[in-house]
Curated annotation (Swiss-Prot):
This is Outer-membrane lipoprotein LolB. It comes from Pseudomonas fluorescens (strain ATCC BAA-477 / NRRL B-23932 / Pf-5). It is a lipid-anchor. Plays a critical role in the incorporation of lipoproteins in the outer membrane after they are released by the LolA protein. Belongs to the LolB family. One of its GO terms (cellular component) is cell outer membrane. The gene is lolB. HAMAP family: LolB. SUPFAM superfamilies: Prokaryotic lipoproteins and lipoprotein localization factors. CDD domains: LolB. Keywords: Cell outer membrane, Chaperone, Lipoprotein, Membrane, Palmitate, Protein transport, Signal, Transport. A lipid is attached at C18 (N-palmitoyl cysteine). Monomer. The keyword rRNA-binding does not apply.
Length: 205
């Protein structure tokens, strides 16, 4: 009797766990979901990095390419774009609730939301708050997502909040498998990130 109850309880617990996992993420593709969860847990703990690379942006009113520098220290970020991006260099810095945008030959602007700043000053509807997750090859945790895994159980693509994100290559840096090339499409905006240098660092414990 005890064994039967234990089996029934374990089965119910398993179903509850699967339901909880699927409530936020729908996973498909070639990869192993268990390996994906391990990979995801490792990257979720990565809260510091420096990125150097290139960015290409195609928007209804302006398009161009330039260089990308991104410094992340837990909830603080410093993202710099420079080169022929149509509007010159731009620097976005801040943390949740306190964000500043500096645009060459225009000035400095502040807001509680990075999305609001970019849309008002540059005309880009870009989910900046999701980018810290997407750039690591992870879905943002606060909304539903549809994931496709590659043969290594890393993200090949994800769909979230009206955006399609594709990952075409990864490299291993300091024990982390991190994206090298990312394409984002949504809200009349196409963005390509080519990451030349990843310097990942786990800061918090």
């Amino acid at each position: 009797m005890f064994l039967r109850h234990f089996i029934v309880f374990s089965f119910i617990a398993l179903l509850a766990g699967c339901a909880g996992f699927g409530a936020r993420e729908s996973v498909q593709g070639q990869g192993n979901p268990a390996q994906w969860r391990l990979h995801k847990d490792q990257l979720t703990g990565l809260d510091g990095w420096q990125i150097n690379g290139k960015i290409g942006i195609r928007a209804p009113k302006d398009s161009g390419s330039g260089t990308l520098f991104w410094l992340q220290r837990q909830d603080y970020y410093d993202i710099r774009l420079s080169g022929p991006l149509g509007r010159g260099a731009a620097r976005l810095t801040g943390r949740p609730g306190q964000v500043s945008l500096e645009v060459a030959n225009q000035g400095r602007y502040e807001s509680a939301s990075p999305e609001t700043l970019l849309e008002e000053q540059l005309g880009w509807k870009l989910p900046v708050s999701h980018l810290a997750w997407w750039v690591r090859g992870l879905p943002a945790p606060d909304s539903k997502s549809r994931l496709t895994l590659d043969g290594d159980s890393h993200l090949a693509s994800l769909e979230q909040d009206g955006w399609q994100v594709e990952y075409s290559s990864y490299s291993q840096q300091n024990g982390y498998w991190l994206p090298e090339r990312i394409k984002l499409n949504g809200s009349d905006l196409d963005v390509t990130l080519v990451i030349k240098e990843w310097l990942p660092r786990k800061l918090g414990q």
